[in-house]
Regions:
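Charged, alpha-helical scaffolding/interaction elements associated with membrane systems
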Residues: 51-52
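C-terminal-biased regions
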Residues: 1-48, 59-129
Length: 129
């Protein structure tokens, strides 16, 4: 059963202005992220969709076109091609206090997945399986 995610823990929201390795990440503002909690809620929800293979919800969370995929229906048909084991692990292993970000948006697992704000939500704009 899929449950709507509407909470982010205190630990997940702790200050991440310096990563554990001592590096200083780009600011959320540079990445275009005005609502860090909203982004983290999106990521938690996306984790759940990935782990339950909810193709419909994941396809709705993609900004099209992406790679050779023009729309939601094509993404659902090509789901296994893009949401590979490695891509799924990139969602499962998110460290909410170490989210890499640049002017392009936020990156998971060394660039396997990229996410950016679109209107009042967030969208996956690149998947590199």
């Amino acid at each position: 059963m899929i449950v709507a995610i509407n909470e982010v823990s205190e630990t997940e929201m702790r200050d991440d202005s310096v990563f554990d390795d001592g590096s200083i990440p780009t600011t959320w503002e540079v990445a275009g992220i005005e609502d860090v909690k909203g982004l983290k809620l999106f990521l938690k929800q996306a984790q759940q969709w990935v782990m339950s293979n909810n193709k419909e919800q994941l396809a709705a969370a993609v900004q099209y076109p992406i790679n050779n995929i023009k729309n939601k229906e094509e993404m659902i048909a090509a789901y296994d091609q893009y949401f590979t084991k490695e891509v799924k692990l990139s969602f499962a292993m998110i460290n909410f206090n170490q989210i890499f970000r640049t002017y392009k948006g936020v990156m998971l697992a060394d660039g396997l997945v990229w996410i950016q704000p679109v209107g009042d939500t967030y969208k996956i704009f690149a998947i590199n399986p």
